[in-house]
Design a protein with these regions (language model features):
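Short, low-complexity, disordered segments immediately C-terminal to signal peptides
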Residues: 19-44
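C-terminal motif of bacterial Sec signal peptides marking the signal peptidase cleavage site
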Residues: 15-17
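Surface-exposed loop and turn segments in beta-propeller and other repeat-based domains
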Residues: 52-56, 125-135, 187-202
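Sec-dependent signal peptide recognition
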Residues: 2-9, 19-23
Length: 252
């Protein structure tokens, strides 16, 4: 009887010892409340990718079209905006009067300047039409872009017909449309103005009531409308600026 009890105690001791050795080896250990476990999503802790040359961010199948510099995130460093253009041969066309035209679309790459290089913040490769689009009886609008007051401004000039511009600001991890301004002209005479502040949900319409009087100075009838909008338009989500619907309130 005593011998049987001895063998039983010996077996229990052997099993306990095996468990202790396994725990000390670091395998199959149950973490305590104070144990910090590694994240199962390494992307969340991955460091940002920096590149020394902004043009290194241009994807295959695109070339640099133009660019500008300025501070977009209020850190005092010169950020970079690149306009890129596709290179597909199938997008070239023969025009009756203008000859061979490149109709590849254009897009934007936005980079923040960091210590040690540039970081990709936003990219939209084909949101703009070609600079060689057909403008009908008049030439197509000319697109320019620049940085002012920590915002990115996209400016369309359309000669005697006026101009319009979109104003984007970096917020909520994207560039959101916070403003729009359009001047619709007849030569040197301004006919209508649309001025929108999407941050305050305010739209101001101005109509020149002296538009048909060449001798009179411009005099505008002003109407201000407040509107509702849940979310702001993000630059990364715009597929085509030519088809962009701002969903503005009607000026009845």
């Amino acid at each position: 009887m005593m011998l049987r009890i001895f063998y039983l105690l010996f077996a229990l001791a052997l099993i306990t010892g095996c468990k202790q050795v396994k725990n000390e080896s670091g395998k199959d250990t149950v973490p305590t409340k104070d144990t910090v476990q590694a994240s199962v999503k390494p992307v969340a802790v991955a460091q940002m990718e920096l590149k020394a040359d902004p043009e290194e961010f241009i994807p295959d199948g695109y070339v640099l079209f133009s660019g500008c510099e300025g501070d977009l995130n209020k850190d005092g460093k010169p950020d970079v905006v690149l306009m890129i253009k596709g290179t597909e041969e199938s997008k070239w066309v023969d025009h009756e009067y203008r000859g061979r035209l490149d109709r590849n679309r254009r897009g934007l790459i936005i980079l923040f300047k960091r210590d040690g290089g540039y970081e990709l913040i936003a990219e939209n490769d084909e949101c703009f039409s070609s600079e060689n689009e057909d403008g009908g009886e008049y030439y197509a609008p000319e697109l320019d872009f620049y940085i002012k007051n920590n915002t990115l401004i996209l400016h369309y000039a359309h000669g005697r017909y006026g101009y319009w511009k979109y104003i984007f600001r970096y917020q909520n991890n994207d560039f959101e449309l916070i403003g729009y301004f359009g001047s619709y002209d007849r030569g040197p005479v301004v006919l209508y103005i649309t001025d929108v502040n999407f941050s305050t949900r305010t739209c101001v319409y101005k109509e020149n009531i002296n538009a048909d009087d060449d001798e009179a100075e411009e005099k505008f009838k002003v109407k201000t409308i407040k509107f509702k909008r849940k979310n702001l338009i993000k630059l990364s989500e715009i597929t085509d600026f030519d088809e962009l619907d701002l969903a503005l309130p009607q000026d009845d």
